[in-house]
């Protein structure tokens, strides 16, 4: 069963993800694609580690969120964008139910 851990472990997981996110930001600013790839991979690695520490199967969660995101498409099967380029919720949108994986 999924659960949060001790404050020490929770803080560690937060710090690891923040550290990798900061490395990603630095790589973007430096326009260093190799370091961007490295940082993104490290973000995934520490995120999956956090999921494991909390007993959360992130593959199952990702699949559910992917299905939800695909439900945002319009009736024509194409994304609906706002003025900033963000995909909006379409008429068949459903909110992902992650509780079934906890």
What are these regions (language model features)?
Residues 1-40, 44-102:
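Flexible "arm" and connector segments at domain edges
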